[in-house]
Amino acid sequence: MLILISPAKTLDYQSPLTTTRYTLPELLDNAQQLIHEARKLTPPQISSLMRISDKLAGINAARFHDWQPNFTPENARQAILAFKGDVYTGLQAETFSEDDFDFAQQHLRMLSGLYGVLRPLDLMQPYRLEMGIRLENARGKDLYQFWGDIITNKLNEALAAQGDNVVINLASDEYFKSVKPKKLNAEIIKPVFLDEKNGKFKIISFYAKKARGLMSRFIIENRLTKPEQLTGFNSEGYFFDEASSSNGELVFKRYEQR
Protein backbone atom coordinates (compact mmCIF):
# COMPACT_ATOMS: atom_id res chain seq x y z
CA MET A 1 0.00 0.00 0.00
CA LEU A 2 1.37 3.38 -1.01
CA ILE A 3 0.09 6.56 0.69
CA LEU A 4 0.26 9.86 -1.21
CA ILE A 5 0.18 13.22 0.56
CA SER A 6 0.81 16.82 -0.48
CA PRO A 7 3.72 18.93 0.76
CA ALA A 8 3.24 22.04 2.92
CA LYS A 9 4.02 25.72 2.43
CA THR A 10 5.10 26.10 6.07
CA LEU A 11 8.58 24.70 6.74
CA ASP A 12 10.52 23.96 9.93
CA TYR A 13 14.31 23.82 9.83
CA GLN A 14 14.83 24.64 13.53
CA SER A 15 13.20 21.94 15.68
CA PRO A 16 15.37 19.11 17.03
CA LEU A 17 15.45 16.11 14.70
CA THR A 18 13.95 12.85 15.94
CA THR A 19 16.09 10.74 13.60
CA THR A 20 19.53 11.26 12.10
CA ARG A 21 18.96 8.80 9.26
CA TYR A 22 18.43 10.21 5.81
CA THR A 23 18.22 9.35 2.13
CA LEU A 24 18.60 11.52 -0.97
CA PRO A 25 15.74 12.49 -3.31
CA GLU A 26 15.67 10.32 -6.42
CA LEU A 27 14.75 13.04 -8.92
CA LEU A 28 17.35 15.69 -8.12
CA ASP A 29 18.42 16.08 -11.75
CA ASN A 30 14.89 17.23 -12.55
CA ALA A 31 14.79 19.51 -9.51
CA GLN A 32 18.01 21.15 -10.65
CA GLN A 33 16.42 21.94 -14.03
CA LEU A 34 13.50 23.65 -12.29
CA ILE A 35 15.85 25.62 -10.03
CA HIS A 36 17.61 26.83 -13.19
CA GLU A 37 14.27 28.14 -14.49
CA ALA A 38 13.19 29.59 -11.12
CA ARG A 39 16.45 31.53 -10.75
CA LYS A 40 15.51 33.56 -13.83
CA LEU A 41 12.55 35.06 -11.94
CA THR A 42 12.80 38.40 -10.16
CA PRO A 43 11.13 38.78 -6.72
CA PRO A 44 8.24 40.77 -8.29
CA GLN A 45 7.74 37.99 -10.86
CA ILE A 46 7.75 35.39 -8.07
CA SER A 47 5.22 37.48 -6.14
CA SER A 48 2.91 37.62 -9.16
CA LEU A 49 3.36 33.97 -10.18
CA MET A 50 2.82 32.55 -6.68
CA ARG A 51 0.38 35.23 -5.49
CA ILE A 52 2.46 35.91 -2.39
CA SER A 53 3.69 39.04 -0.59
CA ASP A 54 6.84 40.91 -1.60
CA LYS A 55 8.51 39.71 1.61
CA LEU A 56 7.76 36.04 0.88
CA ALA A 57 8.83 36.53 -2.74
CA GLY A 58 12.19 37.82 -1.52
CA ILE A 59 12.61 34.83 0.80
CA ASN A 60 11.86 32.39 -2.02
CA ALA A 61 14.12 34.16 -4.52
CA ALA A 62 16.91 33.71 -1.94
CA ARG A 63 15.99 30.02 -1.51
CA PHE A 64 16.23 29.43 -5.26
CA HIS A 65 19.57 31.23 -5.33
CA ASP A 66 20.99 29.35 -2.31
CA TRP A 67 19.85 25.90 -3.49
CA GLN A 68 22.78 23.53 -4.03
CA PRO A 69 22.86 20.16 -5.83
CA ASN A 70 24.81 18.56 -2.96
CA PHE A 71 22.47 17.74 -0.09
CA THR A 72 23.87 17.31 3.42
CA PRO A 73 22.33 17.29 6.93
CA GLU A 74 23.85 20.77 7.27
CA ASN A 75 21.96 22.39 4.36
CA ALA A 76 18.84 20.18 4.27
CA ARG A 77 16.55 18.13 6.48
CA GLN A 78 14.32 15.08 6.12
CA ALA A 79 11.19 16.05 4.18
CA ILE A 80 8.74 14.51 6.65
CA LEU A 81 10.26 16.63 9.44
CA ALA A 82 10.66 19.80 7.35
CA PHE A 83 7.02 20.18 6.26
CA LYS A 84 4.75 21.75 8.88
CA GLY A 85 1.26 22.41 7.41
CA ASP A 86 -2.14 21.08 8.52
CA VAL A 87 -1.52 17.57 7.10
CA TYR A 88 1.71 17.33 9.09
CA THR A 89 0.00 18.55 12.27
CA GLY A 90 -2.14 15.42 11.99
CA LEU A 91 0.80 13.20 11.00
CA GLN A 92 3.05 14.26 13.93
CA ALA A 93 6.13 12.60 12.43
CA GLU A 94 8.26 14.21 15.14
CA THR A 95 6.90 11.53 17.52
CA PHE A 96 7.64 8.57 15.18
CA SER A 97 9.80 5.69 16.37
CA GLU A 98 12.60 4.40 14.13
CA ASP A 99 10.30 1.50 13.17
CA ASP A 100 7.60 4.02 12.20
CA PHE A 101 10.11 5.83 9.98
CA ASP A 102 11.04 2.48 8.38
CA PHE A 103 7.41 1.70 7.53
CA ALA A 104 6.76 5.25 6.33
CA GLN A 105 9.86 5.18 4.13
CA GLN A 106 8.42 2.20 2.29
CA HIS A 107 4.73 3.17 2.25
CA LEU A 108 4.48 7.00 2.24
CA ARG A 109 5.29 9.42 -0.58
CA MET A 110 5.04 13.22 -0.65
CA LEU A 111 4.32 14.77 -4.03
CA SER A 112 6.31 17.95 -4.70
CA GLY A 113 6.40 20.65 -7.35
CA LEU A 114 10.20 20.89 -7.12
CA TYR A 115 11.29 17.38 -6.12
CA GLY A 116 8.56 15.37 -7.87
CA VAL A 117 8.30 12.56 -5.32
CA LEU A 118 9.84 12.57 -1.85
CA ARG A 119 10.27 9.68 0.56
CA PRO A 120 9.95 10.62 4.24
CA LEU A 121 13.69 10.50 4.98
CA ASP A 122 14.78 12.22 1.76
CA LEU A 123 16.77 15.35 2.53
CA MET A 124 15.11 18.51 1.28
CA GLN A 125 16.44 22.03 0.95
CA PRO A 126 13.82 24.72 1.67
CA TYR A 127 11.68 25.82 -1.26
CA ARG A 128 8.24 26.96 -2.30
CA LEU A 129 7.02 25.82 -5.69
CA GLU A 130 3.46 24.59 -5.71
CA MET A 131 2.47 22.03 -8.33
CA GLY A 132 -0.21 24.28 -9.85
CA ILE A 133 2.18 27.16 -10.57
CA ARG A 134 2.60 27.99 -14.25
CA LEU A 135 6.39 28.01 -14.38
CA GLU A 136 7.42 27.80 -18.01
CA ASN A 137 10.19 25.29 -18.64
CA ALA A 138 11.90 23.33 -21.40
CA ARG A 139 9.16 20.68 -21.33
CA GLY A 140 6.10 22.91 -21.38
CA LYS A 141 4.06 25.71 -19.88
CA ASP A 142 3.71 24.39 -16.32
CA LEU A 143 4.89 21.81 -13.79
CA TYR A 144 2.37 19.19 -14.91
CA GLN A 145 3.97 19.20 -18.35
CA PHE A 146 7.44 19.26 -16.82
CA TRP A 147 6.83 16.14 -14.73
CA GLY A 148 4.82 14.30 -17.40
CA ASP A 149 4.99 10.56 -16.61
CA ILE A 150 8.02 10.86 -14.31
CA ILE A 151 6.09 10.97 -11.02
CA THR A 152 3.78 8.13 -12.09
CA ASN A 153 6.76 5.97 -13.10
CA LYS A 154 8.46 6.59 -9.76
CA LEU A 155 5.28 5.58 -7.89
CA ASN A 156 5.05 2.42 -10.01
CA GLU A 157 8.62 1.58 -9.00
CA ALA A 158 7.69 1.95 -5.32
CA LEU A 159 4.61 -0.25 -5.78
CA ALA A 160 6.65 -2.92 -7.58
CA ALA A 161 9.28 -2.85 -4.82
CA GLN A 162 6.66 -3.64 -2.16
CA GLY A 163 4.79 -6.08 -4.40
CA ASP A 164 1.50 -4.24 -4.02
CA ASN A 165 -1.08 -2.50 -6.19
CA VAL A 166 -3.02 -0.15 -3.91
CA VAL A 167 -2.58 3.62 -3.67
CA ILE A 168 -4.23 5.60 -0.87
CA ASN A 169 -4.75 9.08 -2.29
CA LEU A 170 -4.55 11.55 0.59
CA ALA A 171 -3.10 14.29 -1.61
CA SER A 172 -4.95 17.42 -2.72
CA ASP A 173 -6.42 17.60 -6.22
CA GLU A 174 -3.70 20.08 -7.23
CA TYR A 175 -1.00 17.53 -6.44
CA PHE A 176 -2.74 14.32 -7.48
CA LYS A 177 -3.20 15.91 -10.93
CA SER A 178 0.55 15.28 -11.39
CA VAL A 179 -0.19 11.52 -11.31
CA LYS A 180 -1.53 9.69 -14.38
CA PRO A 181 -4.16 7.30 -12.92
CA LYS A 182 -4.48 5.26 -16.14
CA LYS A 183 -0.73 4.61 -16.13
CA LEU A 184 -0.56 3.86 -12.41
CA ASN A 185 -0.35 0.12 -11.76
CA ALA A 186 -2.71 0.33 -8.83
CA GLU A 187 -6.22 0.51 -7.49
CA ILE A 188 -6.75 4.05 -6.16
CA ILE A 189 -8.59 4.50 -2.86
CA LYS A 190 -9.53 8.04 -1.83
CA PRO A 191 -10.53 8.67 1.79
CA VAL A 192 -12.88 11.66 2.14
CA PHE A 193 -13.40 13.47 5.45
CA LEU A 194 -16.67 15.26 6.18
CA ASP A 195 -17.32 17.41 9.22
CA GLU A 196 -20.77 18.36 10.48
CA LYS A 197 -21.59 22.06 10.31
CA ASN A 198 -25.08 23.32 11.15
CA GLY A 199 -26.50 19.83 10.77
CA LYS A 200 -24.89 19.10 7.38
CA PHE A 201 -21.75 17.12 6.59
CA LYS A 202 -19.25 18.78 4.28
CA ILE A 203 -15.55 19.08 3.58
CA ILE A 204 -14.01 21.78 5.78
CA SER A 205 -10.53 22.42 4.40
CA PHE A 206 -8.56 22.78 7.64
CA TYR A 207 -10.13 19.71 9.25
CA ALA A 208 -9.87 17.64 6.05
CA LYS A 209 -6.17 18.41 5.68
CA LYS A 210 -5.44 17.49 9.28
CA ALA A 211 -7.50 14.29 8.87
CA ARG A 212 -5.33 13.26 5.90
CA GLY A 213 -2.36 13.43 8.26
CA LEU A 214 -4.23 11.55 10.98
CA MET A 215 -5.13 8.79 8.49
CA SER A 216 -1.51 8.57 7.31
CA ARG A 217 -0.38 8.22 10.92
CA PHE A 218 -3.08 5.58 11.58
CA ILE A 219 -1.80 3.49 8.66
CA ILE A 220 1.85 3.86 9.68
CA GLU A 221 1.37 3.23 13.43
CA ASN A 222 -0.78 0.16 12.84
CA ARG A 223 1.32 -1.14 9.90
CA LEU A 224 -1.78 -1.45 7.71
CA THR A 225 -1.34 -3.13 4.33
CA LYS A 226 -4.92 -3.69 3.09
CA PRO A 227 -7.45 -0.98 2.13
CA GLU A 228 -10.30 -2.61 4.09
CA GLN A 229 -8.29 -2.00 7.29
CA LEU A 230 -8.72 1.74 6.79
CA THR A 231 -12.39 1.52 7.80
CA GLY A 232 -11.22 1.15 11.42
CA PHE A 233 -9.94 4.74 11.40
CA ASN A 234 -11.44 6.58 14.39
CA SER A 235 -8.93 9.29 15.31
CA GLU A 236 -10.31 12.48 16.88
CA GLY A 237 -13.95 11.48 16.54
CA TYR A 238 -14.09 10.36 12.88
CA PHE A 239 -16.02 7.23 11.95
CA PHE A 240 -16.44 5.26 8.73
CA ASP A 241 -19.75 5.78 6.92
CA GLU A 242 -20.25 2.71 4.75
CA ALA A 243 -23.54 3.96 3.28
CA SER A 244 -21.87 7.06 1.80
CA SER A 245 -18.80 5.18 0.55
CA SER A 246 -18.16 3.51 -2.79
CA ASN A 247 -15.48 1.20 -4.18
CA GLY A 248 -12.90 3.90 -4.74
CA GLU A 249 -14.00 6.34 -2.05
CA LEU A 250 -14.06 5.78 1.71
CA VAL A 251 -16.15 8.39 3.52
CA PHE A 252 -15.43 9.30 7.13
CA LYS A 253 -17.63 11.66 9.11
CA ARG A 254 -17.37 13.55 12.37
CA TYR A 255 -20.18 15.14 14.35
CA GLU A 256 -19.97 18.79 15.33
CA GLN A 257 -18.67 19.28 18.86
CA ARG A 258 -21.46 20.79 20.91
From Swiss-Prot:
InterPro entries: YaaA. One of its GO terms (cellular component) is cytosol. It comes from the Bacteria. Pfam families: H2O2_YaaD. GO terms for biological process: response to hydroperoxide. PANTHER family: PEROXIDE STRESS RESISTANCE PROTEIN YAAA, PEROXIDE STRESS RESPONSE PROTEIN YAAA. Belongs to the UPF0246 family. This is UPF0246 protein YaaA. The lineage of its organism: Bacteria, Pseudomonadati, Pseudomonadota, Gammaproteobacteria, Enterobacterales. The gene is yaaA.
